[in-house]
Amino acid sequence: MYQKEHEEQIVSEILSYYPFHIDHVALKSNKSGRKIWEVETDHGPKLLKEAQMKPERMLFITQAHAHLQEKGLPIAPIHQTKNGGSCLGTDQVSYSLYDKVTGKEMIYYDAEQMKKVMSFAGHFHHASKGYVCTDESKKRSRLGKWHKLYRWKLQELEGNMQIAASYPDDVFSQTFLKHADKMLARGKEALRALDDSEYETWTKETLEHGGFCFQDFTLARLTEIEGEPFLKELHSITYDLPSRDLRILLNKVMVKLSVWDTDFMVALLAAYDAVYPLTEKQYEVLWIDLAFPHLFCAIGHKYYLKQKKTWSDEKYNWALQNMISVEESKDSFLDKLPELYKKIKAYREAN
């Protein structure tokens, strides 16, 4: 009881910094280190969000949110405090206040919705340009760090292969080892290909215009309003190439389908390209990132570190089989970039 009263007192104090009359407050969500309260005010319903992160990091995100809002991206308005701050916080906890927006759920299996999402991603990347964080904020950047990231993931994969070999009777480990050598080889080839690509050139261009990525581009952050995607919140961002978001989105879609659908990929990339055109050399960087076995590495990471404590062995085994199916079926397009690049541009022109 004391903890609940203490929490209510903190929330009340946080809300007192905003220029609204508060009618009612109710805890709406509490998961993954984040709490969300629905707040009824004299200016309509709001959402107060608490995150376990330093205020300097939250400031980097909330100022980016305001930047996107100023650029006209469809995004829930973020509110400033009476003193003009975009967030509040102490030590490791931060708070921000947004308008509550409601719309139609967006799903990965809806082809037309996904095309709209890819188009939205293009608008997002355009709107992100020119963002310069303040000195008080703590920025996050992966620009120029792909080589290091790839090497780290490959080292972890090799380590997980050794762990798997020590559990010969474990079903997950048996399946993992059957495919690990191929995934390791493909990852090493992607690392080599990165050296021969225009990754460094694209990185320098991105550094100059200051664009950022969503980092965790998931449909849970979006809703559909009047037939178009609308961003409910900016969960996390990082300075990086826009292709990072494309890789994450495409992988998420294909995992839902349990197989890589090359024709669908072309249609999705064409929708993005119509808003944010990429050169063939830039698509080559995306192809390299898609070739790297991010999905296979991720499920191994989760299993051997026991990150999903609520998952059963059956769920882990199903997830592994699904990741393998998607990773293996990528062979159908990875060596066809020139042909598929032309298809993406032609599809874009035809639609």
Curated annotation (Swiss-Prot):
GO biological process: sporulation resulting in formation of a cellular spore
Stretches that traverse the bilayer: none
Localization of this protein: Spore coat
GO CC aspect terms: endospore-forming forespore
The keyword Transit peptide is assigned to this record: no
Chief place where the protein resides: other
Keyword DNA damage: no
Superkingdom of origin: Bacteria
Keywords in alphabetical order: Sporulation
PANTHER family with a match to the protein in the record: SPORE COAT PROTEIN I
Function: Seems to be required for the assembly of the CotSA protein in spores.
Family under the similarity heading: Belongs to the CotS family.
NCBIfam families hit by this protein: spore_CotS
Protein name listed in UniProt: Spore coat protein S
